[in-house]
Amino acid sequence: MMILCRLQGVSFVVAVVNYCWPSLPDSLTKDDFRKGLVKFGLWLLKHVPGLLYWWMTQKLFSSANAMEKNPVFFNDRDMEVLKRTPGFELLSENKLEQKSVFDNLRQDFMVGLGKWEFDPLTLKDPLPEDEGSVHLWAGFEDRVVPVELQRFVMEKLPWIKYHEIPHGGHLIVYDSEVCECILRALLLNEEPEAYIRATTELIVS
């Protein structure tokens, strides 16, 4: 409670949705190829992390890193970000050669996408009575975290202020205009009308 009293609010940007959450219906994820990738990745990280580390850093085969600059995961705007942002090193081969970086990412992945002991989709508003606000920002064309999952989270947790970037991908935080809107919404309580999705279509029958 002491920490909550000090918070102005919270902003989640392209937040990862865990396929293991009990409230997430199979009808929403059964055809999502990412679900299988996550399951396989968790198995590798748990049982043979050394093999995965070798594969991600080896030089024998090209494109060892499946995510780096891959249009399967990044839309056109994301690809432009990757081209013009020299410091962007998301899962890059050179960065992963540092074993400590790989180990930290491994722990993050296993905790974030492994089995949790609670269901976040049943949480109550931690900042009631206008004490603060919680925001969720999503890219309509996000190919890492599908927008349908973000919309479902919004439906289950209506106290979250949901913002959807029409042509945004997974790297919307690198868009200076969007980044400014995120900060203004959080710190000044300014609502960017262009990025507010007031209602959603029925996602799960």
Where on the chain are the PLM-derived regions?
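Catalytic active-site module of serine/aspartate enzymes centered on a nucleophile-bearing elbow/loop
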Residues: 151-205
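Short beta-strand/loop motif that positions the catalytic acidic residue
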Residues: 128-131, 135-138, 142
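The feature captures the conserved acid-bearing segment of alpha/beta-hydrolase catalytic domains
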Residues: 117-131, 147
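Conserved alpha/beta-hydrolase "acid-adjacent" motif
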Residues: 143-149
